Amino acid sequence: MVHSKSYLGSLALLVAAATGKEMQPNAQVAAELYDSGVIHDQIMENKISQWTRARELGLYNADRYPELGYTACVNGWIEAIPGDRNNTFRCNNIDLYHFLSHAALGDELAEGSSSWGWTSDDGREFVAIGQYQGTAFVEIGSDGRMTYLGRLPAYSLPSFWREIRTYQHYIVIGSEALNHGIQIFDLHKLLDIDPASPVEFTQDDLTSWTRQLLPLGRAHNVVVNEELGYFAAVGGQPRGDPICNSGLNFFDITNPADPISLGCAAGDGYVHDAQCLVYHGPDTRYEGRDICYSYNEDTLTIYDVTDKANVTNIISRISYEGASYTHQGWLLDVTNQEFLVLDDELDELSGAGEASDGFPVTFIWDIRDLENPRQTGSYKSSVRAIDHNQYVIDGLVYQSNYGAGMRVFDLTSIPSDPTGAGVCEVAWIDIYPEDDGLEGGGIIEFLGTWSSYAYFKSGYIFINTIERGAFTVRLTGSECPPTPVCNADNCLRAFRATSIPGRLEESQEFCATYTNSPFHDASVLPEYARRGCSGDAVARASSACACLPTATAAP
């Protein structure tokens, strides 16, 4: 794991200054580490270092990742190729429908990033896939299988970072690549492609291209407000640009062939990601206003952007205990904007606050008073990883947690219990089996899943990964898992036999390996388990493992 002492030490000072869940930003730390770009630059360097090392280890070799077809999740595992651990994935309530490598999707250098979907007027489902050298296009069929249709090259330097959103039947693409600008492309061009002859689109195929108020042609992200017909390029470079200052850079896109610059909200500097929409909610002062919920590295910043002509109207700006890199978030209900969830991309790596144990933390915010947001609670994932992009659909949040894959949580309890105590993890697919055997079930690095798209009416969910390629999956259920019933039967007694010195520790060691393997039969059970766990010994041993106390880590 790559750590940077320079920023981790400074972040420790910030965490130490915390006096409550929500808190005012630390102006000194903000100036030194965030406004300067130090933290963001070091995160990017950290990622590139990890990805370079993964490439050297062969993790980008397309030969490792053959095409995979439909495979059901059985007893917590998707065994897409029987006996092949590299193509066997932990799961719950999710079946695999299809997998294609990045090479099969037109980019042999891989490096998957963002993705976004579009549904045509006649119900066909398409995905635009961010890759190192451009954007690939697939159609998802009624059987969940992807058909590769072609690609739109970047027509700039390659980039690890490519962000995609839709406006009507257009996609808006931004990138960290120098001189990339913002590409706007008409997805209607996909409708009549013969899959036997995938198309490589040219610059002439673009609906438009712009780099207005982007001095280097770079934007870390793009945000679309479809209702009001605009997009914002955010996180532009260089920092300190006197016009936009890496903030919200607005464009009218009602005529996609001619995007018009509207101005910038530069007042809080760098914006990493945002969700902008017309406000409907309990704070009647802002009903009908154009509001952006922005994730600005060390703060949740809420803007009124109704006036976009180079003015900044900040409604509130707040930080929180353990803030390390405020990355992204999403509203629970866009029609009644009372709560949002927020992820921090660095707290697991820096060991800050609630994430000190390495299990991803998502923060719950009560925004019923836009001028005084409150951080009311949180919830955690069950596998060690770093949390990334998340989107809420009908009470379920679909979260890309890098090496832990896509995790799905039921958030419907939050309005009645905003502490997060009622939130449960209802489904997952862990698409990075390389780290399954590690303590906590995962690695705290920027590897694995980058993005997902779960808005299709068919129920198919698209997942884009950094090294491997693209998955289509579908939920088979969304119920909260039952609490293990730990009856003191002969099986559990055999695992915990206090009369036998070291038996509990022996069982804990066995279970750590046993639960990390999909290949279970009675022959791998210890002799005491085979004797004590009569009947379905494998199932009973699994239940006993779930009921053991957590092993204490060695000092």
PLM features: what roles do these ranges have?
Residues V2-H3, D186, Y455, A537:
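Helix N-cap and loop-to-helix transition residues
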Residues L14-A17, V397, D536:
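Short acidic, glycine/proline-enriched loop segments that cap or flank alpha-helices
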Residues T19-N75, P481-P555:
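Fungal extracellular Ser/Thr-rich, low-complexity intrinsically disordered regions
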Residues T19-T483:
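Feature marking well-ordered beta-strand scaffolds used for ligand recognition
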